[in-house]
C-alpha cells in the first residue's frame, strides 16, 4: 500500500481509529486495518465506512471459545484499503446488530449466519432461514467441543499491540 493510499485510509477511518487493533500487512492478514468492536460500536463504524465509499465484501462467522466471532470485510474500488471489523457475540446472548439497513447486501449474509450459528440480528428486515429448513432446530456450524480461543487463531501481536 502506498503512503498516499495509507494516508487516505487513515483519514477516512479517523473517527474510529481509537477502536483500531491492527494496521495490517495485507500479504499476511488480507486487511489493511482491523478492528475488534463491541456491539454498540458496529453500526456507527459501518455507517462511516459506507459514507467513505466502502462496500461490503462478506460477513463470516467462526465458533470460538469466547462466542461467535463475526467478521465483516469491506473494501473500496478507488483506493486500497481493505478493512475487517470483528465482533464477538457471547453464546448467552447470540444477538448482534443488523447492518442490512446500511448495506442491503448484508441481508443474505446475516440470514446465513443466523442459519448456521444461531446469531439473531436485531432490526433485520426479514430474518427467515436462507439455506436451511425452517424446522431444522440446529445450527450446523456450532461446535460441540474443541473450540479454539481467539488468541490461538490470531497472532497475539495482532490482537494486542496492533502489529501484524
Show where each model-derived region lies:
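Terminal low-complexity/charged segments
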Residues: 1-164
Amino acid at each position: 500500500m502506498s503512503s498516499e493510499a495509507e494516508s487516505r485510509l487513515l483519514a477516512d477511518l479517523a473517527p474510529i481509529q481509537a477502536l483500531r487493533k491492527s494496521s495490517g500487512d495485507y500479504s499476511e492478514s488480507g486487511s489493511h486495518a482491523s478492528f475488534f468492536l463491541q456491539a454498540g460500536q458496529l453500526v456507527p463504524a459501518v455507517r462511516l465506512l459506507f459514507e467513505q465509499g466502502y462496500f461490503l465484501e462478506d460477513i463470516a462467522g467462526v465458533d470460538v471459545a469466547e462466542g461467535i466471532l463475526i467478521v465483516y470485510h469491506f473494501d473500496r474500488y478507488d483506493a486500497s484499503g481493505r478493512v475487517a471489523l470483528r465482533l464477538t457475540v457471547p453464546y448467552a446472548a447470540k444477538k448482534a446488530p443488523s447492518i442490512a439497513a446500511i448495506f442491503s447486501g448484508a441481508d443474505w449474509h446475516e440470514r446465513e449466519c443466523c442459519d448456521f450459528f444461531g446469531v439473531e440480528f436485531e432490526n433485520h428486515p426479514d430474518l427467515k432461514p436462507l439455506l436451511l429448513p425452517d424446522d431444522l432446530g440446529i445450527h450446523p456450524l456450532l461446535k460441540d467441543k474443541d473450540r479454539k480461543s481467539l488468541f490461538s487463531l490470531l497472532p497475539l501481536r495482532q490482537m494486542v499491540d496492533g502489529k501484524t
